[in-house]
Amino acid sequence: MAQNSLRLVEDKAVDKSKALDAALSQIERAFGKGSIMRLGANEQVVEIETVPTGSLGLDIALGVGGLPRGRIIEIYGPESSGKTTLALHTVAEAQKKGGICAFVDAEHALDPVYARKLGVDLENLLISQPDTGEQALEICDTLVRSGAIDVLVVDSVAALTPRAEIEGEMGDSLPGLQARLMSQALRKLTASISRSNTMVIFINQIRMKIGVMFGSPETTTGGNALKFYASVRLDIRRIGSVKDRDEVVGNQTRVKVVKNKLAPPFKVVEFDIMYGEGVSKTGELVDLGVKAGVVEKSGAWFSYNSQRLGQGRENAKLFLRDNPDTAREIELALRQNAGLIAEKFLENGGSEGGDDGFEDEAGAM
C-alpha cells in the first residue's frame, strides 16, 4: 500500500515536470527565447548599476551607492529646495562616466550657466522644451526605447500640461486629466526603462489637499501612479541658511529617502547647497567624518590624524578645499565606514512617522 502511494507521488512529480517543460516551450515559441527563464539557471544575479548623486551622504543613505539605473526616481519638495540641483548633479556624475543624458524641461526654466557650474557638460546634454504633456512624454518614450540614454530628467511633473487643457478656456474644469496622462505614460514606459537600463528622474512639486483635518495636507501632483512605479522617492527640504557673516551664501538641506525598493528606507541626510556651486562636498566630509569618528571634534576645533583642520566648521571646509589630498583620504575612510554611517542616518531621522508630517511609504517590496 505504501509502495503504491509512493509510486503515485513520483508519477505526479514527473507529470508536473513534463507539463512545466511543455508550458515553457510553448511560451518561448509564442513570445521568443528569453521571455521566461529560471532566475539563477545560467548566470549569477547581476548587481544593480548606480549613478552617484553628487552627495556622498545621500549615496550612503540610499544603501546601494547612488540612484539605480533602469528604474524610475521621484524627487519632490517645496520651491527652491534643491530638486533640480540634485538632478543636475546626477546628470553630471553620469556624464563623467561617459553616459549620455537628456533633460526634458517642461517648466522652460533650466539655467545653462548654473548647470555648467555644477559640472554638467552642456555640449553633450540633450534638451527638449515641449509644448504639451503628451509631447513631453512621447519624447521620453522615444529616448528610452532608443536604449542610448543613461539618465533622463523630467522637470517637472506639475508642468506636464495636457493638450486639452492648453486648447481649452482658462476656467475649464478637467478633473483627473493629468493623473490619467501620467498613469498611461508610466504603464508604457516602465518595461522600456527596465530593458534599456535608463534611469528616469521625475521632479515633482507639492500641493495642499483642502479640508484635511488629520495628518499632513501635503501631496504631490500627477496622481498616485508615480508613487507606485518609482523605485526611489526623495523628499528634499530647505531647513536653514548658510551665512558668511550677514550674507546668505547657501541653503542647509535635508533629504529623506521616503521609499526605497533596493535598501531600507526612511534614512535622513543633511548637507549644504551653496549658491553657484551646488552640494558642498567639503561640508559633507566634515559632518560625515565626525559621525563616523574619522574626523575628531574637540570644542570648536576639527582635526584628522592629529592634523588640525580648523576652528569652526567653515574653516575646516576651507582647509579641505585647499588640501584635496586630505579630503580624498577622508572620503576613502568614509566609504569604508559606509555601513556605520547609514545606521546613524536611520537613528537620526528614520522613524516612519516622518518629521515633516509627509505620508511615508515602506519601500522594500
Curated annotation (Swiss-Prot):
Short name of one Pfam family: RecA
GO cellular component: cytosol
Keyword DNA-binding tagged: yes
SUPFAM superfamilies: P-loop containing nucleoside triphosphate hydrolases (SSF52540), RecA protein, C-terminal domain (SSF54752)
Keywords: ATP-binding, Cytoplasm, DNA damage, DNA recombination, DNA repair, DNA-binding, Nucleotide-binding, SOS response
Entry's localization field: Cytoplasm
Binding site for ATP: 77-84
A single GO molecular function term of this UniProt record: ATP-dependent DNA damage sensor activity
InterPro entries reported in the protein's UniProt record: AAA+_ATPase, DNA_recomb/repair_RecA, DNA_recomb/repair_RecA_CS, P-loop_NTPase, RecA-like_C, RecA-like_N, RecA_ATP-bd, RecA_C_sf
PROSITE patterns per UniProt: RECA_1, RECA_2, RECA_3
Annotated GO biological process: DNA recombination; DNA repair; SOS response
Coiled coil: none
Predominant location category: cytoplasm
Family the entry assigns: Belongs to the RecA family.
Protein's job: Can catalyze the hydrolysis of ATP in the presence of single-stranded DNA, the ATP-dependent uptake of single-stranded DNA by duplex DNA, and the ATP-dependent hybridization of homologous single-stranded DNAs. It interacts with LexA causing its activation and leading to its autocatalytic cleavage.
Name the record gives this protein: Protein RecA
Source organism of the structure: Mesorhizobium japonicum (strain LMG 29417 / CECT 9101 / MAFF 303099)
